A protein has these predicted regions:
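Short beta-strand segments enriched in small/hydrophobic residues
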Residues: 50-68, 126, 187-191
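Beta-alpha junction/loop-to-helix N-cap segments that form part of ligand/metal-binding clefts
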Residues: 35, 39-42, 66-73, 86-155
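An alpha-beta-alpha
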Residues: 60, 161-216
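Loop/turn elements at helix/coil->beta-strand transitions in domains of secreted/extracellular proteins
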Residues: 50-53, 90-93, 118-122, 141-145, ...
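Glycine- and acidic-residue-enriched helix-capping/strand-helix junction motifs
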Residues: 63-73, 196-201
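C-terminal segment of N-terminal export signals and the immediately downstream linker at the start
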Residues: 25-50
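N-terminal secretory signal peptides and thylakoid transit peptides that target proteins
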Residues: 1-20
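Signal peptide-proximal N-terminal region
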Residues: 42, 47-49, 73-95, 210-215
Length: 216
């Protein structure tokens, strides 16, 4: 039996959910059109008579590849299953894949390529908050759509991102409330690595511990 860490499991299921949501999003958008694509020049468009182009942007190389490879595999599996079921209103989903290379500026660069040069309908991608924050200005400038496939620290909202995972208050605060109620905990030790998710999550947790639970 193969075992997955909680983050990897959430990432895989979140990626799968994101791809399935995209199917609904694109099909709804397509049904809203009052004209067939045959009536327009579809060269370079995200949706043509035969295909719907989407981008997949994860780290396939570098230190983050060990986590992100599973996400892109789940997304490609979901798209394969959608295509085998007839696609989106008879259109096959065409994948354009890019490698973020575990480098945050590269995520921004590849996001711009997918939106500006490849004209994808949406991008499934990023993993760390650093990669998402690097790519976010590009999606907002180009009015693109990013499906972010895993949980994150919160404190960020954008009309150009669908956050498919929980944010920190939906995870950590529930756990703290349980420990306080069931175990009577008063003193807490917050331990995490030095990057965006732990730093922000610990700030949220500390405020909840002190202001709501009366602990320290």
């Amino acid at each position: 039996m193969k075992h997955f860490s909680r983050r990897k499991f959430l990432g895989k299921t979140g990626a799968l959910l994101g791809a399935m949501i995209a199917a609904g999003f694109i099909s709804t958008s397509a049904m809203a059109e009052d004209y067939p694509t045959a009536a327009v020049n579809t060269t370079g468009l995200a949706v043509t008579d035969d295909t719907v182009k989407v981008g997949i942007l994860h780290s396939l190389t570098g230190t983050m590849a060990i986590s992100e490879t599973g996400a892109q595999e789940a997304e490609k599996l979901a798209i394969k299953q959608i295509n085998e079921s007839g696609g989106i209103l008879g259109r096959q989903i065409e994948i354009i894949q890019e490698d973020g290379a575990s480098d945050w500026p590269t995520f921004a660069e590849k996001s711009r390529k997918l939106l500006v040069n490849d004209h994808v309908a949406a991008v499934f991608g990023c993993w760390t908050s650093a990669s998402r924050k690097a790519a976010l200005p590009v999606f907002e400038q180009q009015n693109g759509l990013l499906y972010y496939p895993t949980f994150y620290e919160g404190l960020e909202q954008s009309h150009n991102v669908i956050y498919t995972g929980q944010e920190a208050t939906q995870q950590i605060l529930a756990g703290l409330d349980w420990v306080a109620k069931e175990k009577g905990a008063k003193t807490y030790y917050l331990i995490g690595s030095d990057y965006i998710w732990p730093r922000t999550s610990m700030k949220i947790a500390r405020k909840h511990i002190e202001n709501v639970l009366g602990g320290k």
